[in-house]
Amino acid sequence: MQNSRTLRRLAADHAQLHNDLPTNYLFPPNPQHDDDLSQLDVLLAGPTHTPFAAGVWKLHLAIPDNYPQQPPTANFRTKIFHPNVNEKGQICVETLKRDWDSKLTLRDVLVTISCLLIQPNPDSALNAEAGALIQQDYDAFAQRVELMTSIHASIP
């Protein structure tokens, strides 16, 4: 059960998102968790000039009861081939782990995740195959990303 401080903070973070959603993000047409501030579904369009550019991914944030002291968890609900995302869609980024700061907002979290599509971090790979491929042969990695994007996340 979330306390009043957490609910106020969540309301402020959601208001910020509705007023200033980061670039490349959209709210889905029929959000599943529209009345639950502890759950957030957004769509992330791949950044231009990246192998992800032709795709749109559904992203889910689950906000814990003790937010902002504890970070939200983030999962891709659409399959993505990325060094920092495992098969279950879980995202590995230090901002949501060791580097979390209670001053960070949900908007900051979304910006951090979109930056991972621009600059993957193979040194903290959850997907070992993608991490090795990006380090050994970026062109082959980009081709694989484009193929997986066309299969799972293509823009209709």
Label each region the model flagged.
Residues M1-P156:
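UBC/E2-like fold recognition across ubiquitin and ubiquitin-like conjugation systems
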